[in-house]
């Protein structure tokens, strides 16, 4: 293989690297044409796809944010309803316990009254029976006394 060395002096002598002839303008025109073709074929569709994806993502983020706000509102609403329901349940339980205690107290009071009446009735019945027995015994004592007296009188007479 043969190597050819470029003589740097020969490039500089005839205008060299900075020779402004038709080639430079053709390359510039070619660059502009390639840029516009790439812009039409490649960059615009890609930028449209990227923009549409950004819009899609933005819409989804907005929807997600809206759904999150709605979910938070519903959560707060249901938590308040739950707190209210718990308070009502506690109130109902307390009321039921109070009513049950009042009912039990009323039943106990009624049973005590009935027991007291039964005791009084029994005491009155017992008192009547006692008085009857005493009266009967007094009569028998009188009769026995009379008999003893009569026997004693008959013995002494």
Curated annotation (Swiss-Prot):
It is found in: Plastid, Chloroplast thylakoid membrane. The keyword Acyltransferase does not apply. Keywords: ATP synthesis, ATP-binding, CF(0), Chloroplast, Hydrogen ion transport, Ion transport, Membrane, Nucleotide-binding, Plastid, Thylakoid, Transmembrane, Transmembrane helix, Transport. The chain crosses the membrane at residues 20-42. InterPro entries: ATP_synth_b, ATP_synth_b/b'su_bac/chlpt, ATP_synthase_B_chain. It is a single-pass membrane protein. It holds the Pfam family ATP-synt_B. NCBIfam families: PRK07353.1. F(1)F(0) ATP synthase produces ATP from ADP in the presence of a proton or sodium gradient. F-type ATPases consist of two structural domains, F(1) containing the extramembraneous catalytic core and F(0) containing the membrane proton channel, linked together by a central stalk and a peripheral stalk. During catalysis, ATP synthesis in the catalytic domain of F(1) is coupled via a rotary mechanism of the central stalk subunits to proton translocation. HAMAP family: ATP_synth_b_bprime, ATP_synth_bprime. This is ATP synthase subunit b', chloroplastic.
